[in-house]
């Protein structure tokens, strides 16, 4: 298992199960990629919209968690526009950036682009999302060490 894959498994098991790998982890930018495989497609052999939504909320939550000083965060609203489809075999790139990082509420923008394995330079926007998160929640006792792996992987 390569380092990017093992990092994804450690910090976001659901995304790991789909084949997602993180590239950059910081309080101001989260990026990664997903090869569109049968496990993340709907019956028409295109990326399932729910997978795009999962990526959006996961990346925004991770960024908000870091930007809030590793406080507990929770998504309270997700809006996603599916603009184009990504076909089986395409490669999807994801980027989450903060729009607003307040002490209580954060808003993150998440964009997904597709490329083909043959032409990685030609990126086409497939979805655009806004994720609103509450970011001042208490951390329960059973999750006190939840941020440790993310801090280690992000080298923070």
Curated annotation (Swiss-Prot):
Tissue localization of expression: Mostly expressed in roots, stems, leaves and siliques.
EC number: 3.1.2.-
One annotated GO molecular function: hydrolase activity
Residue ranges annotated as motif Microbody targeting signal: 154-156
GO cellular component terms listed in the entry, alphabetical order: peroxisome
Principal EC category: hydrolase
One GO term (biological process): phylloquinone biosynthetic process
InterPro entries reported in the protein's UniProt record: HotDog_dom_sf (IPR029069), PAAI_dom (IPR003736), Thioestr_dom (IPR006683)
Disruption phenotype: Reduced DHNA-CoA thioesterase activity and phylloquinone content.
Keyword field contains Hydrolase: yes
Pfam families: 4HBT
Family: Belongs to the 4-hydroxybenzoyl-CoA thioesterase family. DHNA-CoA hydrolase subfamily.
Self-association and partners: Homotetramers.
Name this protein carries in UniProt: 1,4-dihydroxy-2-naphthoyl-CoA thioesterase 1
Organism name: Arabidopsis thaliana (Mouse-ear cress)
